[in-house]
Amino acid sequence: EKVIVVGHSSAGHVLQMALPKVADKVEKVIFNNAWLLPDNKSQFDFVPDEIKSVMRQAAIESGTGAIPIDPQFVRHMLASEASDELYEELMTFLVEQPLIIMETPVQAKAFAEMKIPMVLLYCTKDVSVPPGAFLGMFKAWGDNPVVEVDCDHEGLFTAPEVYTEGLIKAINL
């Protein structure tokens, strides 16, 4: 039986490389404010140098090769709509992100050749990237449907009802 895959944020470019390997098992992919990258580009190719250097240094200092969670970035860029209580709870779930995810160029040719339906679940209050950036990344891969939801980058956590309604709509397209 086929599955519907949902990828959020940096999982977008992870899925770009993984999905072609299991394309026969996937009915649809829903990207949620996900980084969808051109072939042979990494997420860091789209991040300002001053931010990259801070992230790389933090990963070195962590001793794990992972970028530690920046509470201020989460609060003001990812979970900008969360109450203080929700923000504190979210912080208990988040984990460091391996630097390699940010630095590895995506091999996206096989992804471009896939014939799997795609939908963007687009969180319209996301301020983690410039306005329209995630929409532009998605539309670069074709004229696929977009479902807008009125929430921030962490909408699944900060506005679960609104997010779930949008997700169900995306599933049913």
Question: What are these language model-derived features?
Answer:
Residues 89-111:
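Active-site nucleophile elbow and catalytic-triad environment of alpha/beta-hydrolase enzymes
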Residues 114, 120-122:
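Short beta-strand/loop motif that positions the catalytic acidic residue
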Residues 7-17:
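Glycine-rich nucleophile elbow surrounding the catalytic serine of serine-hydrolase chemistry
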Residues 69-81:
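Helix-loop "lid/cap" segments that line or gate small-molecule binding pockets
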Residues 20-26, 30-67, 100-107, 130:
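Flexible "cap/lid" loop of the alpha/beta hydrolase fold
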Residues 124-157, 169-170:
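Conserved loop-alpha-helix segment in the C-terminal half of the alpha/beta-hydrolase fold
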Residues 160-168:
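Short, amphipathic alpha-helical "lid/cap" segments that border enzyme active or binding sites
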Residues 3-9, 123:
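Conserved alpha/beta-hydrolase "nucleophile elbow" surrounding the catalytic nucleophile
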